[in-house]
Amino acid sequence: MFIGKKAPAALRKQLWPVFPTYNILGSRNIYVMSHERRKKAAKRKSDKLQQWAEQEEMRLAREKNQQYAKKLKELKQLTRSVASYVRTREARELEAQKIQELSLPSELGKGSEPAGLAAPRSAKIAPFDASAASLSTSAVPLPQSIQDRLGLAVKYLVSKDHQNWSIVLQQLEAAGGFDGLPQKDIRKMVYAIPKDQLRHVFPQIESLLGQAGLAVSPKLLNTYIKSLMLGRTLNDAQIAYIEGIVAKLRQEPGKEGKLGKLSRATYELLIEAYGKNTNVAKMNEVIQEMKELGLQLSPVVYTNVLSTCVYKTRDHQQAVKLFDSMKFLAGSMAPQTREYQDIIVSYVNNDDIEKALDLYQEMLDQKLDFNQNIMVALARGCMSREQLRFKAWDFIFEIYRCGWEPTANTLEYMLYLASKDGDLALARALYQQLNISNALSPRAFSFLFLAYARSNVGKSIEEFQPFAITVHEEGRNFRRNILEKVDLTPTTENPKQAVPYLPKISLSTPQEVLAESSAVMAHALMVNREFVNVESVTTFLNVAARMGSLDDFIDRYEEFTFLDKTGVTETKTVIEPEILESTSVLLAPKEPSPTKSPILAQVTESQKSAFKMPRNTITYLIALKAAAKHKNYIFAQKVWTERGTYRKSAGFRNLPKSEKEKLDFSFASGMVNCLTDMKLLDDALAILVSTEYQFKWTWKELSHLYAAAAEAGYDKVTKTIRGVVKRAQINFEGKIRRKDYKKYVMERGY
């Protein structure tokens, strides 16, 4: 029915609501392409680090002001001291002048005693007794009864650094041994013996005690056990010997007359010994025994267990739990400098420098003492973050500000900081300083090759970034002084110190880097064979992968590594002649490389591959990087085929399951990046899709592939990557789905 304007008003008013009205303007939809969508602004993860860095700068500024005030106060005090010294000196000069003006006796006549020169009344000086003094005075504090019995034998203890206790005990036995000596004096003498000598001379002490009819007390046995525990590690034979001594202690009744019960000190020594042996099960048994006997765990026990978790078993989670327990117990159990040092090292080793810096702030708030190990650990952790890279050297220079003498370990990590930063000139100078000081180690050798691999030599101006140490004036002065004083000329007096550096402070071309690294490796094979291990060979390969040609890398790859086929079932493989010919042409070096040391070729030929290291996942990852850099698909295919054989070997199969999964994921990620660099995006995507539910893929591993696909306009790849990452967040990270959230809201009712 049509309702026109002529219809009655009442009828129109009655029927009008029945018919809805529509807006004649249609809605407009705007479609945005996937690659044009505005990304959500990422939350800045560096805010906390920036805030901490600002607070740290303010703290250092306050410390500088305090130092200036302290220096001003010292200057005023020095001024007063100098004024006092001048007044005293003037008084002395006046007194000396008066003495000079006195007349001599010859001027006053013989037999007359000049007035004022009479001898003052004082005690008579005792005559010198040569028998009471001796040049053979013992430098070791010994009881008087022991010294009297030793007599002239104390000449073997003249210096604290040079003591011959074996001869001293022989002389003591000839003079009557321990007969008639108090047991307290005997214990004091045993405590005075250095631990590195006590472990050898303790059988003589036991013999002397037996001759005197005295029993070996538990305190002496505990001291002997301490001497046996010198060093960072203990092998099974040493543990068995210590357990034999503890078994003797169990046979003697304790204070309560019970057999089998040990003292708290013995239990603590046992825990420390098992920790150095990395035997966590035995440590737990001893701790459980202490609890059953009602012995409360002391801070020493917690410290030993924490140290074992950090340095031996690398169990970071357990270390954190122990540290938190000590903080919860507080009082005498509260963590001190040693415990903070261990937990900071653990956090740094697990790439959590942020938490390590929080603990550093706790130490500042609690006014705890610091040491070099803490400063070195914090410097090492800061170098792993781009935002804190310049802060790393601040912690190193704090060692000098505190007046500490840098240890060899500190110098090694200064070399590491320079290597990580790509400062090859400083790294070579620091390595030479360690070399001249006879403080080289396999770790320092690996750090030097890290410097060669990460060097800024050959980089463009756009890629170059200033060294972290040059940001500080103190750092610039330190670097300049080191480079000016270093002498890189090989010495002929000591072959071990004749490191074959090129005669220049800074290397300028990749060819120079390759040549020098080759010569340094040849020198190590000749005089420091123990330096050539898996870590150093891996970094040696990385130098060629980053700086050299593919032929340079393959030469080192084949010469220094091999595939360990132990446990692999041999299978017969047929290869087409055409493929074999093309592969051999691509992989075989055509002629000797000018960047390879001739001596290295002679050394490797003479030692007949005795230095070769078995290949592992890291070796294959470096090989993939070399193949990707030179766009060589055939070599990359050879690498991942051989890695499949390596997975069947006993060396890989014997690894823990979690470690195998981690290594497989690293290699899969390396394959994706390698294929991405070769512009084979479909192949890279195929690997990603086939392992989607096997590994936890994140943007960290897929950002390179995503950027390459977006640049090429390959929407299929970008869409698939977003889907894989989204599903990984749900499957591995516990992220709730949208439909599950809707269902949850509906069931909850709000």
Curated annotation (Swiss-Prot):
Keyword field contains Transcription: no
Record keywords: Mitochondrion, mRNA processing, mRNA splicing, Repeat, Transit peptide
Xref: Gene3D superfamilies: Tetratricopeptide repeat domain
GO biological process: mRNA processing; RNA splicing
Quaternary structure (record): Binds to mitochondrial small subunit 15S rRNA.
Species this protein is from: Clavispora lusitaniae (strain ATCC 42720) (Yeast)
Note from the entry: Involved in mitochondrial-nuclear incompatibility, a major determinant in reproductive isolation between species, through hybrid incompatibility of Ccm1 and its interacting partner 15S rRNA between yeast species.
PROSITE patterns, A to Z: PPR
A GO-annotated cellular component: mitochondrion
Gene Ontology MF: a single term: mRNA binding
Functional note: Regulates mitochondrial small subunit maturation by controlling 15S rRNA 5'-end processing. Localizes to the 5' precursor of the 15S rRNA in a position that is subsequently occupied by mS47 in the mature yeast mtSSU. Uses structure and sequence-specific RNA recognition, binding to a single-stranded region of the precursor and specifically recognizing bases -6 to -1. The exchange of Ccm1 for mS47 is coupled to the irreversible removal of precursor rRNA that is accompanied by conformational changes of the mitoribosomal proteins uS5m and mS26.
Transit peptide stretch: 1-82
NCBIfam families reported in the protein's UniProt record: PPR (TIGR00756)
Domain of life: Eukaryota
InterPro entries for this protein: Mito_RNA-Proc/Resp (IPR051240), Pentatricopeptide_rpt (IPR002885), TPR-like_helical_dom_sf (IPR011990)
Family: Belongs to the CCM1 family.
Residue stretches spanning the membrane: none
The protein's name in its UniProt record: Mitochondrial 15S rRNA processing factor CCM1
Subcellular location: Mitochondrion
